[in-house]
Amino acid sequence: MSLLEGLALFLLLLSGVLVVTLRNAIHAALALILNFLVLAGVYVALDARFLGFIQVIVYAGAIVVLFLFVIMLLFAAQGEIGFDPLVRSRPLAALLALGVAGILAAGLWGLDLAFTQDLKGGLPQALGPLLYGDWLFVLLAVGFLLMAATVVAVALVEPGKASRAKEAEKREEVAR
């Protein structure tokens, strides 16, 4: 392992640990951006320039902006209702995370995950049939998980707004 590979590995592991352990969500999102940028550098070093650019544009750009948007929604809800709306759901979230990790471990157990196909530098012509062929389920599962996480975050914020709007309407009717 060369010095640059070791540095990239260290930065990937460090930023990954920071994403999970930092208490400030904005700092965790910044650590996630660092992780994505280092991973993009690894892709470029492996001569997969297209994947590196997509990593920066899609993940470090769009996905992190989406995460920050959801984080801001949750912080807005926390300020409006006076408490953290996620406190009661943390044990359930931990249980679900352990369940998903168990399912993933059971599914990956005994699989030969050696990737032997030549991706021709990460060109879209080589990636397209692979993503929409052999790895279609994985691609759809990742998309579904991202969508579900966003919907749940918005759903945590919306009930408070809807009930306040109904209360305001009732007050107006009573005042008439």
Swiss-Prot record:
GO molecular-function terms, A-Z? NADH dehydrogenase (ubiquinone) activity; quinone binding
The topology of this chain with respect to the membrane is:
Multi-pass membrane protein
Q: Where are the transmembrane segments?
A: 2-22, 26-46, 56-76, 91-111, 137-157
Task: Specify whether Cell membrane is a keyword of the entry.
Answer: yes
Q: Which domain of life is it from?
A: Bacteria
Main location as per UniProt: membrane
Q: What is its EC number?
A: 7.1.1.-
Which Pfam families does the record match to this protein? Oxidored_q3 (PF00499)
Q: Where in the cell is it found?
A: Cell inner membrane
Which Gene3D superfamilies does its entry note? NADH-ubiquinone/plastoquinone oxidoreductase chain 6, subunit NuoJ
**Keywords carried by this UniProt record:** Cell inner membrane, Cell membrane, Membrane, NAD, Quinone, Translocase, Transmembrane, Transmembrane helix
- From the record, give the cysteines joined by S-S bonds: none
Q: What class of enzyme is it?
A: translocase
Output a single Gene Ontology CC term carried by this record.
plasma membrane
Q: Does the keyword Cell membrane apply?
A: yes
Catalysed reaction equations from the record: a quinone + NADH + 5 H(+)(in) = a quinol + NAD(+) + 4 H(+)(out)
Q: What does this protein do?
A: NDH-1 shuttles electrons from NADH, via FMN and iron-sulfur (Fe-S) centers, to quinones in the respiratory chain. The immediate electron acceptor for the enzyme in this species is menaquinone. Couples the redox reaction to proton translocation (for every two electrons transferred, four hydrogen ions are translocated across the cytoplasmic membrane), and thus conserves the redox energy in a proton gradient required for the synthesis of ATP.
Subunit notes for this chain? NDH-1 is composed of 15 different subunits, Nqo1 to Nqo15. The complex has a L-shaped structure, with the hydrophobic arm (subunits Nqo7, Nqo8 and Nqo10 to Nqo14) embedded in the membrane and the hydrophilic peripheral arm (subunits Nqo1 to Nqo6, Nqo9 and Nqo15) protruding into the bacterial cytoplasm. The hydrophilic domain contains all the redox centers.
Similarity comment text for this entry:
Belongs to the complex I subunit 6 family.
Can you name this protein?
A: NADH-quinone oxidoreductase subunit 10
Lineage of this protein's species?
Bacteria, Thermotogati, Deinococcota, Deinococci, Thermales
Q: What is the name of the gene encoding this protein? A: nqo10
